[in-house]
């Protein structure tokens, strides 16, 4: 049912007002904002294109991460002079003028370690800093050490980090949690948002917005002081996601904001650039060329925006699951993103109240309530009985069930009866022997069946627990942990994703080989171990038999997590 006409303008006016207040509060920092670093494809122009197209390296990310040894303009000038000379060797030119990223030493864990001991031993192995960042490096400097995912991912990633931080907190490493929150706050202050990762070529997009949840996690240890300290950065990130809303008319979209015909405001994923991704240059060009019926720039934008979603790639964004060139991320309103935006608004309300600004707290509560109504109206498929994404082209909720449907439960935005239906749908369609399936579609893309990802296992587990669905939550945790344990027993490592159709097998598909390490798997595994085992009898390995719900911890524990006065 539509809202009464007189109240709508008043509600919508709150959002621009909030955004302007957020910017006003932070305007003192504007003069300190440095010039945005340019990505390597812009700095190096035709040289970058030629190197990537020559496929000098098996992974396109290698040259994107390479550091110029001198001014890129001088290197480019030298290249233009030399490239047509007889005997010119492109690989030699690259080796002379660039420092390539070093391959990390393969970590060999000590013999006889339990799963918990292995993870605790990995935190220092995965910790990095940017103390030695050079002027032309694509790596963006950060003030504090940080934990990377592992493998080819040599930098910090936005949404990965939240699930890594859950594990750091579980291990009692609150200093590392605080460092990572400080780093992300620094990025917001410096660039106006948190980029996909701390690389210049990631600056044109963000990722699922977990910063407010990171601050909330830190507040478990530091109390409301953390909420008050990082309120300005949370406000500034919210302004980034809502940028352009004040000029939107009904039925329009601007960057990351969507205004539906009835005035409902929701968000979508978006990348400010519409060119091939430097880290996947050749692959993106090939994808665009394979569909001549669409402008290449449109495909590039949708590829980049899918990377912003964290789900790169998935049938979720595609008209034809077998053809990546049919993806249209920017015309889809994602249920997980809008759940996170709801949670951001709720945490902003809490932080504003802690800071003594009740008027602002009430504004954020109003925004959260309006978004919750939008989620229930547009992102619920009543015919199927599950949450789903909204299609801006068909003006209908989509039919596909994905693990993203659990996000409204995770942030407590779901109606009770709908949460119960989600539990049934999850158990019927997504639960597999090795954990929760990402989707039920086999497309060959990594964010589809049969792959299961640690963050989605945790979101589902927590979300179902929030609504009393503890048996299904235990099933997910137990099946996924068994998969992790079996893989660890055989290979002595934790990996980025798992094949959930069985147990003990890493996942496949996507643009690169399976990566090990792995930050968010480590974090979620620790949280789940402490969830399924009683507090008085913590387990260091996954029990051989499924624990009963009564014997398990009723709420996830976090070491030393009591708020400090």
Swiss-Prot record:
The active site is at 312 (proton donor/acceptor), 496 (proton donor/acceptor). Residues 1-30 form the signal peptide. Residues 538-565 are annotated as: Disordered. One of its GO terms (cellular component) is periplasmic space. Residues 548-565 have a biased composition (Polar residues). GO terms for biological process: cellular hyperosmotic response; trehalose catabolic process. The keyword Flavoprotein does not apply. Substrate binds at residues 152, 159-160, 196, 205-207, 277-279, 310, 511. Keywords: Glycosidase, Hydrolase, Periplasm, Signal. GO terms for molecular function: alpha,alpha-trehalase activity. Pfam families: Trehalase. It is found in: Periplasm. It comes from the Bacteria. It is an enzyme of class 3 (hydrolase). Its EC number is 3.2.1.28. Coiled coil: none annotated. PROSITE patterns: TREHALASE_1, TREHALASE_2. InterPro entries: 6-hairpin_glycosidase_sf (IPR008928), 6hp_glycosidase-like_sf (IPR012341), Glyco_hydro_37 (IPR001661), Glyco_hydro_37_CS (IPR018232), Trehalase_periplasmic (IPR023720). It catalyses: alpha,alpha-trehalose + H2O = alpha-D-glucose + beta-D-glucose. Belongs to the glycosyl hydrolase 37 family. Monomer. Provides the cells with the ability to utilize trehalose at high osmolarity by splitting it into glucose molecules that can subsequently be taken up by the phosphotransferase-mediated uptake system. This is Periplasmic trehalase. It comes from Escherichia coli (strain 55989 / EAEC).
